[in-house]
UniProtKB/Swiss-Prot annotation:
Keyword Transferase: no
Main localization category: secreted
Alphabetical keyword list: Amidation, Cleavage on pair of basic residues, Disulfide bond, Knottin, Neurotoxin, Secreted, Signal, Toxin
GO cellular component: extracellular region
Record flagged with keyword Signal: yes
Domain observations: The presence of a 'disulfide through disulfide knot' structurally defines this protein as a knottin. The cysteine framework is VI/VII (C-C-CC-C-C).
Record GO terms (molecular function): ion channel inhibitor activity; toxin activity
Localization per record: Secreted
Protein name, as recorded: Conotoxin PnMSGL-03
Pfam families on file: Conotoxin (PF02950)
Similarity-based family: Belongs to the conotoxin O3 superfamily.
Residues carrying Leucine amide: 78
Signal sequence range: 1-20
């Protein structure tokens, strides 16, 4: 094989290695963003649940969750 052929193959191999490395980095960043989103979402949900529990505690009832952003309190939660 000529020198030019070897150089072209080497260049193609380098391009392949660089692009696959970039793809792996982007995938890792996407996974990290997804984990951060889940963590923030659970934190928001936990805060809302705590507020609901405090609100219903004043009425001596159980917090059954939020409906349209408002706490739903009842003596017994169904479903």
């Amino acid at each position: 094989m000529s020198r030019l052929g070897i150089m072209v193959l080497t260049l193609l191999l380098l391009v392949f290695i660089v692009t696959s490395h970039q793809d792996a980095g982007e995938k890792q960043a996407t996974q990290r963003d997804a984990i951060n989103f889940r963590w923030r979402r659970s934190l928001i949900r936990r805060t809302a649940t705590e507020e609901c529990e405090e609100y219903c505690e004043d009425e001596e009832k159980t917090c059954c969750g939020l409906e349209d952003g408002e706490p739903v309190c009842a003596t017994t939660c169904l479903g």
